[in-house]
Regions:
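HEAT-repeat alpha-solenoid elements in large eukaryotic scaffold proteins
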Residues: 2-20, 46-62, 92-103, 146-159, ...
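Acidic, serine/threonine- and proline-enriched intrinsically disordered linkers and terminal tails
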Residues: 2-31, 132, 266-416
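Alpha-helical scaffold repeats of the Armadillo/HEAT/TPR superfamily
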Residues: 6, 32-35, 72-79, 113-124, ...
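Long alpha-helical repeat scaffolds
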Residues: 6-9, 38-41, 56-60, 79, ...
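Alpha-solenoid helical repeat scaffolds
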Residues: 22-61, 65-69, 75, 123-128, ...
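Elongated alpha-helical scaffolds that mediate protein-protein interactions in large eukaryotic proteins
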Residues: 24-34, 42-44, 50-53, 60-78, ...
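Alpha-solenoid helical repeat architecture
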Residues: 43-46, 84-87, 102, 126, ...
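Alpha-helix N-cap/helix-start positions at coil->helix boundaries
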Residues: 48-49, 65, 89-90, 107, ...
C-alpha cells in the first residue's frame, strides 16, 4: 500500500467461526482427511443447509494454519469459490467470509487461491450481484447481503495486493466501473464505502489503467467525501482513504492536484493524526473485562456488550485512519518520483536512488519537495504528529487489550501503527530540513529515543527492529551530511565509548534478518565516520573496534548485498586521509584484499537481487580495488 514497505506484513485475521475448539485444532491426520472429504461432499450438495454447514466447517479449519496445506492440496478453494454465486444469500455470505479469511493467511495462500481460479467467481459476483444492487430496508437478508459485499471487496483487495495476476484480471473486468457507485454515503453504509475505498487505495497505486478508470468514474464522489463534516472516527477514516485514492489516481504526485485540493488533503491527514491514540486506547481498556486469574475473561452481555463493541469499532476505525494517513504521508515524501514507472536500470535512476538514500552533495532530498508541500508539512506539524504514533499506550493498557479476544485486533493494530510510523519518520528525516527537526540536537534525540524502541521494547519484534534501525541510520545520515566536515556537531558523540555501542554490536551478531543487519552495520559505520572528525585515544579505539567488528561480520555474511554494505561502509569511514594511521593499525588494506574475491564470487552466485541491492553490490565491487590501491599507497608513505 505504501512505498515504504519492503515486504507485506501479515494482515489481521477476522474470525468467521464463533468457536475453535482444541479438539479441532489437534485433529488426527486421518480424521482431518475425512473432515475435508465431508466438506467437499457438502459443498457440492444440492441442499442449502448442507452447503452452509460445509462452509462453516471450512471456516473452522482455516483458523488453524496447519490445515492450510491440506485445504489447498485438496482443492477446496476451487469447490468453495463458485458458491459466491449461489442463489441462497446465506451460502454466498458464508463462502465470502471463509474465502476472505483464507486470503489473509499469507501471500503464498493468495497465489494458491489464484491457481484454483478464485478470480473467476469473484469477478462474476461483482458483475452479477453488485452492478445494480442497493440495500433494501425491507429485505430480511439486507445485513447479510451487505456483509457479503464487504467480504468480497476485502477478498478482492487481498488477492490484488498479493498477486499481479489478480490485478490483471481486475483490469479486464468491469469491477472498476462498478465500485465507484458504492462511494455514495446517501445510499450505502459507511462500512461499505470504507471497504471500497480501502480496496481502491490498494489497486489504483502504480496501476495506470486503474488510475484512469477511477479518475473518470469517481472523481466527483471522491471530492464529495473529502468535504464530509464531523470528527467521528468513521468520518475521518472515509476522508483519509478518499484523500489517499485521489493522490494515487494522479500517480502519487500530489503536486499535480489543484492547490486548494492539496490544502484540504494535508489538513485531513494532519487532523486524523491529531487524535490521541494512546488516550482512546486507555479509555477503551477501562471498559474491557479483565481476566479472572486462570486466563478466562467473562464477556459483557446485553447493552454493555453493545456499548463495548461500538467503542472497539470506533477505536479500530481511528487506528486504521491514522495508519492510512501515515502511509500516504510516507509516499508523498518518498524519494520515488511519480513518473518513474519504468523501473529501467538507467544511470539516472541509480543517481536518483543514491541521492535519496544518501543526500549527496548537489540537490538535497529536502529540496525535492515543492515549497507548498514543505510549508504544509511544517505548519501542520506533521513530523511531530507522526512521531507521536511511534509511542505505544502504557504497558498495562497493552496487556489488557491483548488479553481480551474482542480487543486483540486493536493490540495488533497498535504494533502495526508504530512500525508504519517509524518507516514514515525514516522518509520524513530525509525530506525535512534539519532546522525543522530541532537541529542536530533534535535529530540526535530522535536517534537515542528510537534506539530505546529498537533494543529495549521487544527484541523479538522483527518489524519493529527493522523500521527502528532504519530511522536510527537515517538520523545519523542527517547529522553526517549536515556536518559536512564540521566537527562542532560531532561533539555529541565525542564521549562515545565501546560500552555505548555494545548493544548494537551484539544486535548485529545475533540478528537473523538481513535488512536489520544492514541497518546496524551502516549505523555503526556512520558513528565511526562522525568520530573521525574528533580523533583522540578513546575515539580511535572505538573506530578500530568498529572496523575489526565489521570486517569479522563481513567474512561471516551470506547475503552479498549485506557484505557489499559492510565493505561500502568501511570505504566511507576510511576515505578521509586522517584515517591512514588507523587503517595501518588494523591492517585494513590486507583484510579488504581478502574480501574482494569473496565479494566477486558471491555477486556472481547471487544475481537475482532487487534493483537497489544490485546498485549497491555493483558500486562496492567496482570501488573496492580502487580504494585498496589508493589507501595502500597512502599507508606506504607513513
Amino acid at each position: 500500500m505504501g512505498k515504504i514497505r519492503k515486504s507485506k506484513p501479515p494482515r489481521a485475521k477476522r474470525s468467521l467461526a464463533a468457536d475453535n475448539s482444541d479438539e479441532e485444532e489437534q485433529l488426527p491426520v486421518d480424521n482431518k482427511e475425512n473432515a475435508i472429504q465431508t466438506i467437499l461432499d457438502q459443498l457440492q450438495g444440492a441442499d442449502i443447509e448442507e452447503k452452509y454447514c460445509g462452509l462453516q466447517t471450512f471456516a473452522m479449519l482455516i483458523e488453524n494454519p496447519e490445515n492450510i496445506p491440506q485445504i489447498i492440496n485438496r482443492g477446496l478453494v476451487k469447490v468453495a469459490a463458485p458458491l459466491l454465486l449461489d442463489p441462497a444469500s446465506s451460502v454466498r455470505n458464508a463462502a465470502a467470509g471463509a474465502l476472505r479469511n483464507l486470503s489473509t493467511i499469507a501471500m503464498e495462500t493468495c497465489d494458491a487461491m489464484m491457481e484454483q481460479d478464485v478470480m473467476t467467481p469473484v469477478t462474476c459476483y461483482f458483475h452479477e450481484h453488485a452492478e445494480s444492487w442497493v440495500p433494501d430496508p425491507n429485505s430480511k437478508t439486507k445485513d447479510e447481503d451487505s456483509d457479503t459485499f464487504i467480504q468480497c471487496v476485502n477478498l478482492l483487495l487481498n488477492l490484488c495486493e498479493s498477486s499481479d495476476l489478480a490485478v490483471k484480471y481486475l483490469g479486464q473486468s468491469r469491477i472498476l466501473d462498478i465500485l465507484p457507485r458504492y462511494l455514495d454515503l446517501g445510499t450505502f453504509s459507511s462500512e461499505i464505502v470504507t471497504a471500497v475505498l480501502q480496496c481502491l487505495f490498494v489497486v489504483v497505486e502504480d496501476n495506470p489503467a486503474a488510475m484512469n478508470k477511477i479518475k473518470s468514474n469517481a472523481e466527483k464522489q471522491l471530492e464529495t467525501l473529502l468535504g464530509l463534516e464531523g470528527t467521528d472516527p468513521s468520518v475521518l477514516l472515509v476522508k483519509t482513504l478518499a484523500a489517499g485514492v485521489i493522490i494515487n489516481t494522479c500517480g502519487g504526485n500530489i503536486t499535480t492536484l489543484p492547490v486548494d485540493v492539496i490544502r484540504r488533503i494535508m489538513t485531513i491527514l494532519a487532523n486524523t493524526l491529531s487524535v490521541d491514540h494512546r488516550l482512546i486506547c486507555s479509555q477503551l481498556s477501562s471498559n474491557v473485562p479483565l481476566s479472572d486469574g486462570p486466563g478466562k475473561v467473562e464477556a459483557p452481555k446485553g447493552k454493555a456488550a453493545q456499548q463495548l463493541d461500538s467503542q472497539i469499532q470506533s477505536v479500530t476505525q481511528m487506528l486504521t485512519a491514522q495508519q492510512s494517513s501515515i502511509e500516504i504521508i510516507a509516499n508523498i515524501c518518498s524519494c520515488e518520483d511519480g513518473d518513474d514507472q519504468g523501473n529501467d536500470s538507467s544511470e539516472s535512476d541509480e543517481a536518483d536512488e543514491e541521492l535519496c538514500e544518501n543526500g549527496d552533495e548537489g540537490v538535497l532530498a529536502e529540496d525535492k519537495l515543492p515549497p507548498e508541500m514543505m510549508e504544509a508539512f511544517i505548519s501542520l506539524e506533521v513530523f511531530d504528529k507522526v512521531w507521536a504514533r511511534t509511542q505505544l499506550p502504557a504497558q498495562n493498557v497493552m496487556l489488557i487489550l491483548k488479553e481480551y479476544d474482542g480487543s486483540q485486533l486493536i493490540y495488533k493494530r497498535l504494533l502495526s501503527l508504530q512500525t508504519r510510523a517509524l518507516l514514515c519518520i525514516n522518509n520524513l528525516l530525509s525530506t525535512l530540513p534539519i532546522e525543522n527537526l530541532g537541529g542536530v540536537n533534535g535529530v540526535y534525540k530522535i536517534w537515542v529515543d528510537t534506539g530505546k524502541l529498537a533494543f529495549k521494547q521487544d527484541p523479538e519484534n522483527e518489524n519493529l527492529a527493522e523500521s527502528a534501525t532504519a530511522v536510527m541510520r537515517a538520523a545519523l545520515d542527517k547529522i553526517k551530511f549536515r556536518d559536512s566536515g564540521n566537527s562542532n556537531d560531532c561533539n555529541l558523540f565525542s564521549d562515545l565509548a565501546l560500552s555505548d555501542i555494545e548493544l548494537m554490536l551484539t544486535g548485529i551478531k545475533e540478528c537473523q534478518v538481513p535488512e536489520i543487519r544492514s541497518n546496524l552495520i551502516r549505523m555503526v559505520g556512520i558513528l565511526a565516520l562522525l568520530l573521525v572528525n574528533n580523533l583522540n585515544d578513546v575515539t580511535s579505539n572505538v573506530i578500530c573496534t568498529i572496523t575489526e567488528f565489521i570486517l569479522e561480520q563481513a567474512h561471516k555474511e551470506n547475503e552479498v548485498w549485506v557484505l557489499a554494505e559492510a565493505i561500502d561502509t568501511l570505504v566511507d569511514v576510511y576515505s578521509e586521509d586522517e584515517t591512514d594511521v588507523l587503517a595501518a593499525k588494523v591492517k585494513l588494506t590486507d583484510k579488504l584484499a581478502i574480501l574482494a574475491p569473496i565479494l566477486k564470487n558471491k555477486a556472481r552466485q547471487q544475481k537475482r537481487l532487487p534493483k537497489e541491492y544490485k546498485v549497491l553490490v555493483s558500486t562496492a565491487t567496482s570501488n573496492l580495488p580502487r580504494f585498496i590501491k589508493y589507501k595502500k599507497d597512502r599507508i606506504s608513505r607513513l
